[in-house]
Amino acid sequence: MERGMVTAISLLKSSNYRYKIIEAIGNETLTPSEIATKTKLRLNHVSMFLRELKENHLVKCLNEESRKGRLYELTELGKDAITKLTKK
């Protein structure tokens, strides 16, 4: 398993919030508010963890320049990591 994948899986396993956010996004493109609603997490927590997930290349923001209504989706690394974690 490559180093990036190991880091991604470790990051997701170490926080239930990160895992919930990645799982909520899945194959969709969502705003932080939509993610907060789906996960029942507070919006400020969602925003904080999205920033962290973006820094680790698990999610990407499609409209970085927008102040409101930013859209997030999983990167290939994020999709691969969640697939590995849910595979039994």
Question: Which functions belong to the PLM regions below?
Answer:
Residues 16-23, 80:
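Pre-recognition alpha-helix immediately N-terminal to the DNA-recognition helix
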Residues 41-55:
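Short amphipathic alpha-helical interaction segments
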Residues 16, 27-31:
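Short capping segments at the starts of secondary-structure elements
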Residues 66-85:
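Basic, amphipathic "hinge/linker" alpha-helix immediately C-terminal to the N-terminal HTH DNA-binding motif
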Residues 1-19:
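Short alpha-helical segments that sit at the start of domains
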Residues 30-38:
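Short acidic, hydrophobic short linear motifs in intrinsically disordered regions
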Residues 23-27, 86:
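Short, locally clustered residues in the helix-turn-helix/winged-helix DNA-binding domain
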Residues 56-67:
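Beta-hairpin "wing" of winged helix-turn-helix
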